[in-house]
Amino acid sequence: MSRQIMVGGVAVGGGAPVSIQSMCNTATEDVEATVQQILRLEQAGCEIIRVAVPTEEAARAVPAIKARIHIPLVADIHFDYKLALLCAEGGIDKIRINPGNIGAKERVRAVADACCERGIPICIGVNGGSLEKDLLVKYGGVTAQALVDSAMGHVRLLNDCGFNDICISVKCSRVPVNMAAYRMLHEQTDYPLHLGVTEAGTPEMGVLKSAIGIGGLLCMGVGDTLRVSLTADPVEEVIAAKRILQAAGIRRSGPDLISCPTCGRTKYDMIPIAREVERRLKDCAKPITVAVMGCVVNGPGEASGADVGIAGGKGEGLLFAKGKILRKVPQEQLVDALFQEIDKL
């Protein structure tokens, strides 16, 4: 089991639930826009939020933002260590630094000392796009071992400064390399791991990459917190993260819809019905399994683990629960009958 750190009031690692993170795409110095986006993210289920801090103005906005939100705030720092010091003074809940560009050891020590004084954890954020040049030369490019060496080198640097309140992130856009690096870290250290696939892309492909790269690791017991990085509204990152956690069997945050792919036995127009059920389930928060099956022959049996479901036939279908048939229902009433049963659960 990984060791535990506290990011504000959220425990990360040490057996705590895998937490969902996102990152604002507003200008951090625009306090109103940033706060409004964070409030939307909170409502969607985000539990830790990160903001970019490229300027002193952005760093000085931290206290005003923190005063109006309800989840921990993380500062993303590149190049200028003094911005990390300002954020620490402003009450930030965690600081993310990149070992490839933060600078000399004295600068890292200054950040570590400031965080140690205030109980602020540091996330070592290694990115394939900004690996140290000597590692790129040594390994001939961005490899899993290069990512791990960068992270562990910075862990040692922080440890030398007497700092141990650490989590680690190693991200690149190539899923197999990403997964290999995280597996290696999982074997080499007990610091909590922040999972993600960087530059994953737009939702269509980015969710797929993240489902494999993050979900695969979660299924192996690797990872303590995650962010799904998408070229989209950050709320979509949170929705995708919740779905990945649910699909991996880690956290239930609502209903799970199962449906068959249809075949020649299907005697009704099932695909639009499945989509209608999916649409209506978005307003349901119950941790239940709902089935939409293609035929009355196999449907109830194949979906016997579902809390409730429907199986279509010619002109009518079956409503069932836990594999037991409840009644026959005319096809045009199937969806309404299904949701009447869901309301009873």
Residue map of PLM features:
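Hydrophobic faces of well-ordered beta-strands that scaffold small-molecule active sites
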Residues: 18-24, 49-51, 73-77, 95-97, ...
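N-terminal amphipathic alpha-helix/helix-capping segment at the start of soluble metabolic enzymes
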Residues: 1-23, 116, 279
